[in-house]
Amino acid sequence: MGKKAKKKARAPTKEIQTMEISKKVSEEPPSQAGEIAEGDVKAVKETQACVHFDKALNLEKVLDKIKSSRQIKCAECNEGVYGKRGTKAKGSKGKKDFSSSDPKSNNKAIWLCLECGCYVCGGVGLPNGPQSHVLRHSRVTRHRLVIQWENPQLRWCFPCQLLLPVEKEDNGEKKDVLSEVVKLIKGRSLNNLASSDIEDQCSGSGSITSDIKLEGAVTSDIEARDGYVVRGLVNLGNTCFFNSIMQNLLSLDRLRDHFLKENGSGVGGPLASSLRKLFTETKPEAGLKSVINPRAFFGSFCSKAPQFRGYDQHDSHELLRCLLDSLSTEESALRKKRGVSDNDEKSTTLIESVFGGETSSIVSCMECGHSSKVYEPFLDLSLPVPFKKSPPKKPQPVSRAKKAKLPPKRVPKNVSKVSKVSKVLPGMVLSELNSSGKSMAVTADSDTSCSSLAPLDNGPVLETPSVLTLDNNQASESASQSDTGFDGSWLDFIGPETSGDETNLDMQEDGIDNVITAEVNQIVPSPNIVANSSVSSGDQTLEGNTERLMQDYEEIAKAEANLDEKDVQAMQSDECPATSGISAEFSQASCIGCDPGIGESSSSVNPWDEEELPLVVADSQILYMPYKEISCNDKSVEGECEASSSFVTGDHEPQNSDFVDFGGLFDEPETTEGPVFGPPSKAEASGVGFMAFSSESDPEEIDDSDLPVSVERCLGHFTKHEILSDDNAWNCENCSKNLKLQRLREKRKSNEDESRSSNTSNGWVKENEDEGFGETEILAVKQDPNDTSCVKDHSSDGRKAARIHSADESESKGTQDEDEDSEKVITVKRDATKKVLINKAPPVLTIHLKRFSQDLRGRLSKLNGHVAFKEVIDLRQYMDSRCSGEDPPVYRLAGLVEHSGTMRGGHYVAYVRGGQRVKETDSSSTAWYNVSDAYVRQVSLEKVLHSEAYILFYERIFSQE
């Protein structure tokens, strides 16, 4: 018993030894296996012929097994080809080496034995892995040939340790012996894919298996060997914008024909070479890996476009333009090195020959009918999309930052606060409405120290050029601030309106019973210079005297009527220049917001002298009274004049301790609303104002209220007539030329009129005007000096010569003027119509829908909504000239890019057409795939047409195909 037990214990050891031996045998050709694992796969056509294929193949048995089998699962571990749920079979005996629960089971594929039709799992690349069931099946059953279910292009022979060619020569013709097997595999793959997707959704596991990872799925038509395999691309770090564009470029037939032609003999630059490798990895016979790593190509591209380095999110349309431009520039540089001239017919680059089209812009003048046509090349059409304007938001009250109140200034008790009124502009008069609604006037009388307050009726106000008039709100503001002192800035007059009651209460608190009148002893010509004035204040009340004010008003009117203009001119000549300049500037400001009658009276001359009468002020008026005549030769006055001018311009800071600078009062930073585009910062996470730098407006929706928005509608809007007017008016060359000729004619005519008028002034032009050349010829014949009759003729000849010389001078002068006029550029702006049409249709039409926009504030927004598009589109109605001999511009959809999310963060996915080359308009023979980075799944055409497309790729249908 013990010996038997020992023999049984040795059996697994032998099995392990055989496995190790098989492992060594499988690793004997490291060059081939290593190259395949790295993705640098040689073409299957270059492999050697297998001597076991004809002997071992049992085609009938394999076909019967495929037709009779219900599920495609591994016979050892019961792992499905699509589900991969990781369930163990009863006969697996719980071995960990072959269990599907192994994390490496996701890298397995189903292989079909070509001798018995058994399904076994193995490696995705090659079936000779050390822990694959297909290797164990071959070792146990001695079966040598297998084919991969997910990619029938892979046929493997275990004794030869190499891939089998797809086609085999038979009587000089290349045929695929396994074509029937491949057709059955393809039919079963599509059916199982649909049923597996339905089961996963019903069982609730759709979160994992709804995005079926078709690693190396067969998407090419084997009969048409120019198809390709849709394979995922590794996300290198927020590179979905790059992967979505590359999936569409890899699906274009024209690019594939160029890069795969003659095995890539025409090697280009580094960017084109790395792109050729990507196309090679998508060949059907090279589908040995599930996912392609585009790191080499992306690094080569970033060397030419460094703005895409890093891990930031970018726009896929921007990347497409930069990529095409880089490829075209690289090819042009190589052609220059090779000495290819630009005039050669083949000088167009690959990108221009595939994506290049041409538009014609026709502009017609609405005045003369002249039209101009300009041709512009394009690589893609950017079409604007109509959108719904967001409803206007309710106006929110603008919360302006309140002025920081300064601490009260300490003033000696014996000095009344009223004395600070002396810092106000000399002779300033404030008017305000009292509680009874009548106007309360403050008058400044230079003859008396007492102030008077009286209600006034509204009446005309006499103004002078040196009087500044402000509105009622400004007057009340200045009156309310008179108790705290004038801060030296006219900006204080701009502020909220203060009622008369509040002002009176504030003034009573300061010990002022009524508005105060300042007596000016010495007046300086500057609004902010403190004058030598005294203000009478105290407990005495100011009594109003309406009759006295009316009498003063009548005296003022009489004084104005009796003024003489000479006195006015003399008085103006004695004024200081700086003062007059400031007065003129202030008088212009006084016209703003004042009554028409007041504005007219402001143009009158200042009639006031030293003994001026009190001035009557109407409502809503603030007047700066005129100043005394002071000679500008005084140094102190000169300094004050300089201070006055600098105060107006804001270039001088007074040294007065009571001065408060409000120059930056309105320099508040503009705050923006809305979310921010870009990665959030720490300030944003904590709620700090990150919004102030960049923001994102609310997402907008496509306007489909009138008609459903479609690509055809966007093309119609792109090619419709546009009226150019106002600032966008067109510079019509024909109108400019006509105007130029008209001006030359007028100039020539005026020169002729001037020459005639000058000759007429000599008195003899009319007499000899008709004789002209005849008299000159006669004078030329009479050349005998002895003849006395010739004297008069010679004198007349001199006059004739002078006349001819002057005429020549005028003619040369006119010609010179014409030359000068011809050199002048005359531009005439005319209203015109503009229409853009497609003049040359490209082989691959790229349509970019403008879903991203930026407003005037710099806020970014995305336009959400579906834009309808068709699988087949006809551009004949958008062409400039109708197609006669060439193929009509009919296109078929090849792929698209979709963006989901917002401006802050989103994701790009690609929808591409897989399978055979498009030869017919029938879409039933092709399959569509949704590719999201490394994940690939098959979708229906209806789902593709309902996606929110951002970039569309259309391939032109040619009759010769």
Curated annotation (Swiss-Prot):
Binding site for Zn(2+) 3: C113, C116, H137, H143
Residue numbers binding Zn(2+) 2: C74, C77, C121, H133
One term of GO molecular function: cysteine-type deubiquitinase activity
Catalytic activity, as annotated: Thiol-dependent hydrolysis of ester, thioester, amide, peptide and isopeptide bonds formed by the C-terminal Gly of ubiquitin (a 76-residue protein attached to proteins as an intracellular targeting signal)
Keyword Aminoacyl-tRNA synthetase tagged: no
Protein EC: 3.4.19.12
Domain of life: Eukaryota
Xref: InterPro entries: Papain-like_cys_pep_sf, Peptidase_C19, Peptidase_C19_UCH, USP_CS, USP_dom, Znf_RING/FYVE/PHD, Znf_UBP
Annotated GO biological process: protein deubiquitination; ubiquitin-dependent protein catabolic process
Region annotated Disordered, chain positions: 1-36, 85-105, 387-418, 744-770, 784-826
Active site (catalytic residues): C240, H907
Pfam family, one: zf-UBP
Bias (Basic and acidic residues): 790-816
Record-level GO cellular component terms: proteasome complex
Enzyme class: hydrolase
All copies of domain USP, residue ranges: 231-957
Mapped zinc finger ranges (UBP-type): 48-183
Keywords carried by this UniProt record: Hydrolase, Metal-binding, Protease, Thiol protease, Ubl conjugation pathway, Zinc, Zinc-finger
Ranges annotated as biased composition (Basic residues): 1-11, 400-412
Binding of Zn(2+) 1, residues: C50, H52, C157, C160
Family: Belongs to the peptidase C19 family.
Function: Recognizes and hydrolyzes the peptide bond at the C-terminal Gly of ubiquitin. Involved in the processing of poly-ubiquitin precursors as well as that of ubiquitinated proteins. Is involved in resistance to the arginine analog canavanine (CAN).
Descriptive protein name: Ubiquitin carboxyl-terminal hydrolase 2
The organism of origin for this protein: Arabidopsis thaliana
Organism lineage: Eukaryota, Viridiplantae, Streptophyta, Embryophyta, Tracheophyta
